[in-house]
Every structure is written in C-alpha cells, then in structure tokens.
C-alpha cells in the first residue's frame, strides 16, 4: 500500500532533495548549487519553511514558504509578519495530476494558518499559462504587481505576483 506524508522538511531531507535536483539539472546547474546552500541556511535561520510530499519514502513534490523579506525579490507587498511568499512549487513529472501536490498545498496552508499567517502570495512568469491556471484554481486571484526577478547566473525573468487570503 502506498504511504503518502506531507510534512515540514528536515535538513537531511533538504540535502537529499537538493542533491537530486543538482544531479538531474540539464542546464544552469550553478543556480541549483547556489539555491541549495541558500535554502538550507535560510531554513536554519527561520526565514523559510520547506514543505515536502513524500510517497513511500521518496520526495515527490515540494513547496517553500518564505517568511522574511530579506529572502524574497521585490518583497514589498509579498511578505511580512502575516503574509508568506510561496515558491518552488515542484512535482516529479510521473506524479503530476494525481492529487499529491493538492494535498501538500492544503497541509501547507493549514500549517501557515496555525502559525498566524493570514495571506499567501506567489510569483509566476506571464507565459506559464498552465501554472497560472493552477494558481487561480487554488484561489490566487488578487493581482498584486508585475516586476522582474534575477537568477544567480544573471538570467532576468518577468514575474506577475498574486495573493490569496487564508
């Protein structure tokens, strides 16, 4: 029988997940290496909460809640004492469309509510229509602003930001 668990990640689980991402990156591997170091440090400093969906001891989906403006680009209006910024929505392709991420998302929202958060925000690239459709389904209907973000290697992307009250 399949056993699926939603949880806040441990540092060991984060190391395993990031090593997997680095080893499977087909391009911009340097970004993944930087993100691993940054995210583990941010978790240890209480700036983020990483959430994992684990099926039969395998991490199959994830999302991270950023809790501090120091770790969010264009942070104004996106993160504060009562607003968490959600990032890194990922599900391994063979598990997509099977409800696993939906369960993780519900777990994360309940956990953030229990921690006193009243709103969550996200960023999405304008051309990511599939992701935007999913986010709208999850209730991210409040357009906050548009801006640009930068990857560690200098890549610049356009981003639309949306919010959802909890």
Model-predicted segments: where are they?
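Acetyl-CoA-dependent GNAT
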Residues: 11, 24-88, 92-93, 105
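Conserved active-site alpha-helix within GNAT-family acetyltransferase domains
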Residues: 102, 127-144
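Conserved acetyl-CoA pyrophosphate-binding loop and the N-cap/start of the following alpha-helix
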Residues: 95, 99-107
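Short hydrophobic/aromatic beta-strand or adjacent loop that forms the aromatic wall/cage
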Residues: 48, 156-161
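Conserved N-terminal entry element of GNAT/NAT acetyltransferase domains
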Residues: 1-16, 20, 166
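Conserved GNAT acetyl-CoA-binding A-motif
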Residues: 112-124
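Conserved beta-strand-loop-alpha-helix junction that forms the acyl-donor binding cleft
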Residues: 122-132, 149-153
